[in-house]
Amino acid sequence: MRTRFLIVDDSELVRKSLRTVLQANPEWEICGEAPDGETGVELFKELHPNIVILDFQMPGINGIEAARRMSEIAPAVPIVLFTQHASSDLEKHAKEAGIRSVVSKTNAFPMVGMIEALLGPTDSEPAAAEPGNSEKGPS
C-alpha cells in the first residue's frame, strides 16, 4: 500500500517542489494539496492521509492551529511543519499541537530521511534476520 501525503502550503512553488521530491519515491503518493490551513483540515477529514506536510504561516488559520485540529481527528497521523520561521519557541508550540517534526525550508535536505523515520519500516523493506533463525540449505 502506498503512503498518502497531504501537502498544505500557500505557496504553489513550495507545493510543486514537495510534490516533485515526494513522488520520486514510488511508494509515496500525493492524495491532496491545500493552499491554506482551513482547506487542509477539510481535506484531512475527507482524504485520510498517512502523513501531512504543512506550512506555518498561511492565510486564515496557521499551521499550528491546523495541526491541532488534525491531531484531534486522527492523533496517530504524523504531521511535519515545513516552515521558514523555525525557532525553539515555534517547535515547542508545534509539539503541543501534535506536530512530530519541524523542518526549516532553508535546509530541506533532511526531509526525506526524516519522513522515512516517521513512517518506520515499510512492507517492501526486508526485515532484519533474527539471531538463531537463519535458514539452512539441505545438508
Predicted feature descriptions by range:
Residues 36-39, 62-65:
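Acidic catalytic/metal-coordinating carboxylates
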Residues 2-14, 18-22:
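Conserved acidic segment of CheY-like receiver
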Residues 47-53:
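Active-site beta3 strand of CheY-like receiver
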Residues 65, 85-113:
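Alpha4 helix (beta4-alpha4-beta5 surface) of REC/receiver domains from two-component response regulators
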Residues 58:
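Receiver (REC) domain active-site loop signature in two-component systems and cognate sites
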Residues 45-47, 69-76, 97:
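Conserved phosphotransfer cores of two-component systems
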Residues 8-9, 34, 52:
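Conserved sequence signature across two-component system core domains
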